[in-house]
Amino acid sequence: MRTVGVEEELLLVDPATGEPRALSAAVLARAFLDDSEQDVFEKELHEQMLEFATHPQADMERLHAEIVRCREEAGRHAGGIGCAVAALATSPLPVTPSIGVNRRYEWMAEQYGVVVHEQLVLGCHVHVSVDSDEEGVAVIDRVRPWLPVLAALSANSPFWQGRDSSYSSYRSRVWQRWPSAGPTELFGSAERYHRRVADMLATGTVLDDGMVYFDVRLSQRYPTVEFRVADVCLDASTAVVLAALARALVDTAAREWRAGAEPAEHSVSLLRLAAWRAARSGLTSELLHPATMRRMPAESVVRDLLEHAGEALAAAGDLERVREGVEKLLRHGNGARVQRELLARTGSLREVVAACVRRTQAA
């Protein structure tokens, strides 16, 4: 069975005011003092964020337990220096981000200017194991039209600089400012994929292959394909639903490839429109259907995703968990809806952050 690993980026906030705190270096130092052998947590581009990565897991129950544990540990380390962690993909409250200190980040700031300074956005990346680069590229070609559906399920960033953005995932719109970000055309082979990356690097526009920010890509460090479209999810259980769906999409795509089925030839222009619509309305309105690229109710598109990936979900033993998780999202809403409902109820973005801090730590 394919293994799955999850990387989550968490926002460091003041527990009293809800404002982001530039304390990632101090939190990492605290984590090292508590456990000198820990290698779970890493710094990121901005000092108001902290990243962790799980181990590869084949069992979704174990993956869920590890995500919960990592969130709890992050909260404990942050609490030791007077801040808290929140699984929020953007800060609801206004913030002036602080860029971390290292040569890579300095190069990025000089090269991209305000794009870097405004990139305090937090995502969830899912790694799914593949047998080879050839299989991985075949998967990338075949999962492309389904990625906006995953983005809609995860959407958790309605607020930007203290106001409602009108988007469910404004994080994804900010992320698209990077020159290498977004959907890709069909590659057709691993050789063409690697040639395309080499051509991009040869322009000098991106620093290295780590900055090739395709929506789904071959990992530079692991034998995996890496899904990069999701907001960090408010609930750990939603992150596991995304991970299980990503694995099922990989299994389904690999099976289609081995059977000789050709991938859908949707243009990058249409895929960008599908991604925009998912970011704009999440699960509240319509999405572009992956088969037709025409508008359909979001609930219908999500149910078609379950049907498309259902055989693989059942084979992995994940079907019931994913069905229940998806029904919960359709019934009660994704993180974006939860945040808006919190604001409507409390009238305070500070209270929104406080509630999300508590929810981040919940099992």
From Swiss-Prot:
<keyword id="KW-0436">Ligase</keyword>
<dbReference type="Pfam" id="PF04107">
    <property type="entry name" value="GCS2"/>
</dbReference>
<dbReference type="GO" id="GO:0016879">
    <property type="term" value="F:ligase activity, forming carbon-nitrogen bonds"/>
</dbReference>
<comment type="similarity">
    <text>Belongs to the glutamate--cysteine ligase type 2 family. YbdK subfamily.</text>
</comment>
<comment type="function">
    <text>ATP-dependent carboxylate-amine ligase which exhibits weak glutamate--cysteine ligase activity.</text>
</comment>
<dbReference type="GO" id="GO:0042398">
    <property type="term" value="P:modified amino acid biosynthetic process"/>
</dbReference>
<keyword id="KW-0547">Nucleotide-binding</keyword>
<dbReference type="InterPro" id="IPR014746">
    <property type="entry name" value="Gln_synth/guanido_kin_cat_dom"/>
</dbReference>
<keyword id="KW-0067">ATP-binding</keyword>
<dbReference type="InterPro" id="IPR050141">
    <property type="entry name" value="GCL_type2/YbdK_subfam"/>
</dbReference>
<dbReference type="GO" id="GO:0005524">
    <property type="term" value="F:ATP binding"/>
</dbReference>
<dbReference type="GO" id="GO:0004357">
    <property type="term" value="F:glutamate-cysteine ligase activity"/>
</dbReference>
<dbReference type="InterPro" id="IPR006336">
    <property type="entry name" value="GCS2"/>
</dbReference>
<dbReference type="InterPro" id="IPR011793">
    <property type="entry name" value="YbdK"/>
</dbReference>
<protein>
    <recommendedName>
        <fullName>Putative glutamate--cysteine ligase 2</fullName>
        <ecNumber>6.3.2.2</ecNumber>
    </recommendedName>
</protein>
